Amino acid sequence: MKTAVLSLLLALQAYARVTGSPSGFAAGTTGGGSATPAAPSSLDELVQWITDDTPRVILIDRTWDFIGTEGTTTGKCCSMPSTTVCNGGTSKGQAWIQDHCDGGSWVSCKYDNAALTPMDVGSNKSIVGVGNKGVIKGKGLRVRNGNKNVIIQNIHITNLNPQYVWGGDAITLDNADQVWIDHNKISLIGRQFIVSGWGKAGHVTISNNEFDGRTSWSAGCNGKHYWTLLLLGEQDYYTFEGNWLHDVSGRAPHMGTDHTKSQIFFHGVNNYFQNLGGHAFDVDTNTWVLLEGNYFENVKTPLTDTSLKAGGKLYTTSTVNAAGACLDKLGYICEWNRLAGSGAWQDRTDADVKTKAATYKNSLVGHYPVADVPAKVVANAGVGKV
């Protein structure tokens, strides 16, 4: 019996550990490094391992369900006419968990407490799903307070009070650095799939993830989740590569703010935006955004009009000339972005983006032809595909 158990553990360790290594801005991130991979045996042990200061490779080999573990709250939530009532909408709306309700009315609500407080991930951690079994249900992950060198790979984070705005965030970065978020799936979240700020997120690679916005409760009243990615950190460098964002309706992503000293460089490459009922990119001030090889299919607004006026610097690579003009500063020809059945994609070629990107040349990832994006991304993004 002991021999069988030992064989199973050894097989598990061999099968599930970090696959590959990050490219782009999170290059060099090692997470738990050479620590022996191990699967926790209880929720308490899972939380302890994630939050302590010991380097670890934590295997998620089952569904860890936090719903109900910290009780529920029954009280009043705010119902807003435009996001909750949804007259004429195709889905239910989202009520708001908050202490004010200007312009709305109070309604009775009941929500789960566990989702409101994410697990704080310690430094030098790899949190890795086994096959397609790794699920964290009802609670998110947060890297903050100077913690760094974290890998989150092959995990499905789901069911954080999806019927309520402010119901919970899946992944939070706040005063962090060296974070690789790879081959995960995020679905049915109350607030943001990924959020950064107000402190720095640091050097981050977000690659090969599936952002699944299908929901029965939508602030856009259209069955598509609105709160996708909100990037507001003080000094942030993002590689956003090979991700599949589908059936969402906003902040996909939003980046930048004038409320802090936020400074963001964002390199978006070979991502697939599919069936977006609202906007994809929404760019504010103090940002430098290089976009190439992204495919927008059935996206109502690939780039908001506000993005063109808010002061952010954009290189949208929408023409052959714009693609070729990358060569002088970056040393390669950029890949153009492609639209199918989508709204307008504005041509912006701010030289400041190329100048800044040239200083990060070693962190710029390569691209493949944009025509290949839908098939390759769908085949590769999400859990069970590492």
Curated annotation (Swiss-Prot):
Annotated glycosylation sites: 124
Record-level GO BP terms: cell wall organization; pectin catabolic process
Cellular localization per UniProt: Secreted
GO terms of molecular function: pectate lyase activity; pectin lyase activity
SMART domains in alphabetical order: Amb_all (SM00656)
Catalysed reaction, written as an equation: Eliminative cleavage of (1->4)-alpha-D-galacturonan methyl ester to give oligosaccharides with 4-deoxy-6-O-methyl-alpha-D-galact-4-enuronosyl groups at their non-reducing ends
EC number of the protein: 4.2.2.10
A GO CC term assigned to this protein in UniProt: extracellular region
Gene3D superfamilies hit by this protein: Single-stranded right-handed beta-helix, Pectin lyase-like (2.160.20.10)
Disulfide bridge positions per record: 77-101, 326-334
Endpoints of the signal sequence: 1-16
Catalytic site: 251
Keyword Signal (UniProt): yes
Keyword tags: Carbohydrate metabolism, Cell wall biogenesis/degradation, Disulfide bond, Glycoprotein, Lyase, Polysaccharide degradation, Secreted, Signal
SUPFAM superfamilies, alphabetized: Pectin lyase-like
Protein family: Belongs to the polysaccharide lyase 1 family.
Function (record text): Pectinolytic enzymes consist of four classes of enzymes: pectin lyase, polygalacturonase, pectin methylesterase and rhamnogalacturonase. Among pectinolytic enzymes, pectin lyase is the most important in depolymerization of pectin, since it cleaves internal glycosidic bonds of highly methylated pectins.
Protein name, per record: Probable pectin lyase F
Natural source organism: Neosartorya fischeri (strain ATCC 1020 / DSM 3700 / CBS 544.65 / FGSC A1164 / JCM 1740 / NRRL 181 / WB 181) (Aspergillus fischerianus)
Gene for this chain: pelF
